[in-house]
Design a protein with these regions (language model features):
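N-terminal subdomain of nucleotide-sugar transferases
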Residues: 1-126, 130, 462, 468-475
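A short, well-ordered alpha-helix in the C-terminal region of glycosyltransferases
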Residues: 183, 418, 425, 432-447, ...
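Aromatic "clamp/platform" in nucleotide-sugar-dependent glycosyltransferases that forms part
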Residues: 366
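Short hydrophobic beta-strand element within catalytic cores of glycosyltransferases
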Residues: 383-386, 390-397
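Carbohydrate-associated surface elements
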Residues: 244, 265
Length: 475
């Protein structure tokens, strides 16, 4: 089967949990041919892959959002029929447009995005929306907000569409929209896998963002919900990593009958025999994390600073690359400003080898799905302290029916004292750490094996092939 994986902002450009998962996933399915349709932010990253692509990746199609800002060329006068005008009106007003009509306008008719945005039709629609929703907002603010919202979408709708039997999106958002476009153009089924709930993550970012005009924050949030609604509607199956995520998808409008839970899985044998660190009088804490705002490394630094004031013989090892250069510099500056001792930025390391130096691990993310770093830590019998996000409580405390026991502590996000208290409790007893680590290892061995995950996805592809009369393995 020829499967188009649609990815946004991750593989193969950056390291991280989703990228690691994706690389291993492709390698483990040599029976399928994969096409990567990848969305990046900056065209300067074209071809700059940090992974050596597996041999069963047949093609890579790269699309960069900042290319939309450089659109030029002679604009043509465009006319739209009543059906097209209605679809465009609903797009601008964020009210359930007919996406197949929009795909036809920008794919088959090849209408240039700027031709629409500079057309009388757009200005008429835009005026009506502003009068209805933003009568007291400056015209310039409304126009630039609308343009910056629509231009990337219209640009993506005109993208070259790779041919595939199935379009498998690894998020909603822009990636989900491209998967729907591929489905429409080539009459192929769509699958969706969400590691986190993309729309909720964008909502959190927009609420905190300084670049969004306050009166338009609600519109930006509605925009991302609009994108998710289409792939939830069109997808044959929608997978999530844990039960609460599935519930969120259903609450956001996805048909419950198409929603499946397929947990992450790790290569357990790589971690299960890593020896525990000898008791040397120090407690070593590890954080396998990229330096990125969503990982909230600053709160981790503050919490460790407070812990070190209470317990001098503790060390923190932050293991990961820099995802955001500005944020990375701010993290290093914070360490210097506070005068934090015994904190080591290791950069990217071989986690299996480095795990021998650690007593337990910590994760302070603002948002997560089902973090591989926590699964790997538990597989290596290292308990964890995490924020109460995503699947972390289930991983450490167990889901319904899981009686293995507590394998770590959770704290609310961005609560440095709570994290410091949890780390102090973990530091207090080596015997408790060992017991928790063994519980966590048994949980991973039972529920989170790589082989189980792959079997579930193979079954999903097989079900899709049967339902849509597609080529199947061995045919």
């Amino acid at each position: 089967m020829r499967i188009c994986l649609v990815l946004e902002g991750c593989y193969p450009y950056v390291h991280g949990g989703v990228s690691t998962w994706m690389h291993g996933y492709i390698q483990a399915m040599p029976e399928h041919e994969f096409v990567l349709w990848v969305i990046g932010a900056h065209a300067a990253d074209r071809g700059k892959f940090v992974y050596e692509l597996p041999g069963n990746v047949a093609e890579v199609h790269e699309v960069f959002l900042d290319d939309a800002l450089r659109l030029s060329g002679e604009q043509q006068e465009v006319d739209f029929n009543d059906r097209e005008r209605e679809a465009l009106r609903r797009l601008v007003s964020l009210s359930n447009p007919d996406w197949d009509v929009l795909f036809d306008i920008f794919q088959r008719r090849r209408v240039h995005p700027l031709s629409f945005l500079q057309s009388r039709a757009f200005m008429d629609i835009f005026r009506d929306v502003c009068l209805a929703e933003y009568p007291y907002t400056p015209f310039a603010d409304a126009f630039h907000t609308m343009r910056s919202m629509l231009l990337p979408v219209l640009y993506l709708l005109g993208s070259e569409v790779p041919v595939a039997d199935v379009y498998h999106a690894i998020s909603t958002g822009y990636g989900g929209l491209l998967a729907c476009l591929g489905s429409s153009v080539h009459h192929a089924p769509v699958l969706l896998t969400e590691h986190g709930i993309y729309t909720r993550e964008r909502e959190e970012e927009i609420i905190r963002a300084d670049w969004v005009v306050p009166s338009f924050k609600d519109r930006w949030i509605r925009f991302f919900y609009l994108l998710s609604e289409e792939i939830y509607r069109r997808a044959f199956r929608v997978t999530s990593l844990f039960h609460n995520a599935r519930k969120t998808q259903i609450d956001m409008g996805c048909d419950a009958d198409k929603c499946l839970v397929i947990p992450n899985g790790i290569q357990f044998d790589r971690f299960k025999d890593i020896p525990l660190k000898p008791d040397d009088g120090w407690v070593d804490i590890g954080a396998v994390v990229r330096l990125a705002p969503i990982k909230d490394v600053k709160t981790m630094i503050y919490a460790f600073f407070e812990l070190h004031e209470r317990l001098p013989r503790v060390r923190l090892h932050i293991m990961g690359g820099v995802d955001d250069e500005e944020y990375g510099a701010e993290c290093h500056a914070l360490v210097d400003t506070l005068g934090v001792r015994d904190l080591i930025f290791t950069g990217r390391v071989n986690v299996v080898e480095y795990m021998e130096k650690l007593d337990f691990t910590i994760l302070t993310s603002i948002s997560e799905g089902q973090p591989l770093s926590v699964l790997e830590s538990l597989a290596a019998r290292r308990p964890c302290v995490t924020t109460e996000v995503g699947c972390c409580p289930e991983l450490l405390e167990g889901a319904p029916g899981d009686d293995f026991g507590v394998a770590g502590f959770v704290s609310p996000p961005m609560y440095r004292k709570g994290l410091a208290d949890a780390m102090e409790r973990m530091c207090a007893s080596r015997a408790r750490r060992i017991e928790m680590g063994e519980r966590g290892q048994r949980r991973v061995a039972t529920y989170f094996l790589h082989e189980q995950m792959l079997a579930n996805y193979r079954a999903l592809y097989d079900e899709t092939a049967r339902a849509f009369d597609l080529p199947r393995e061995g045919e």
